Amino acid sequence: MLAIALLVLLCASASANSIQSRSSSYSGEYGGKGGKRFSHSGNQLDGPITAIRIRVNRYYIIGLQVRYGTVWSDYVGGNQGDLEEIFLHPGESVIQVSGKYKSYVKQLIFVTDKGRYLPFGKDSGTSFNAVPLHPNTVLRFISGRSGSAIDAISLHWDTYPSHCNTC
């Protein structure tokens, strides 16, 4: 009898875990095949995305750096080109990223939940449009490959962190 009770409890627990809602999703990888892998997965622990720096030249997205909470990620990519920077308003989040690519990422356009449209780079190449799979989720971190430019980019979505008091 005890064995049956334990079996029922185990099945009920497994069933409850299987119906929990998922919140994370992944978009990408968009771009070429070169470069060295990078990931900001650990940076998301510093808080939500609060600012983005993008270095561009006439042809490509050369480099990028993202601020998570109040901490900037390591810069990835090359050093040539113009550095552009945008800051998100408190509580504002990126909910869509579109762009263009060929062998390198050529354009990135960030769209926020406050209706802002933040474009970087050149409008040429193969188009992509990345949005989260699950409702009420936002861009949490970026990964990809880089060398002298941003070769490829991936976007990672999840719920807005509830633990950031300074963001």
From Swiss-Prot:
Keyword Signal: yes
Tissue specificity annotation: Expressed in pancreas, colon, duodenum, and much less in stomach.
Keyword terms: Cytoplasmic vesicle, Extracellular matrix, Golgi apparatus, Lectin, Protein transport, Secreted, Signal, Transport
BP-aspect Gene Ontology terms: defense response to Gram-positive bacterium; protein transport; suppression of symbiont entry into host
SMART domains to which the protein is assigned, alphabetical: Jacalin
Taxonomic placement: Eukaryota, Metazoa, Chordata, Craniata, Vertebrata
GO cellular component: collagen-containing extracellular matrix; extracellular space; Golgi lumen; mucus layer; zymogen granule membrane
One Pfam family per UniProt: Jacalin
UniProt function note: May play a role in protein trafficking. May act as a linker molecule between the submembranous matrix on the luminal side of zymogen granule membrane (ZGM) and aggregated secretory proteins during granule formation in the TGN.
Every Jacalin-type lectin domain range: 24-159
Species: Rattus norvegicus
UniProt keyword annotation of Transport present: yes
Family membership noted in the UniProt record: Belongs to the jacalin lectin family.
Molecular-function annotations in GO: carbohydrate binding; peptidoglycan binding
SUPFAM superfamilies, per database record: Mannose-binding lectins (SSF51101)
Subcellular location: Secreted, Extracellular space, Extracellular matrix; Zymogen granule lumen; Golgi apparatus lumen
Gene that specifies this protein: Zg16
Superkingdom assignment: Eukaryota
Stated name of the protein: Zymogen granule membrane protein 16
Signal sequence bounds: 1-16
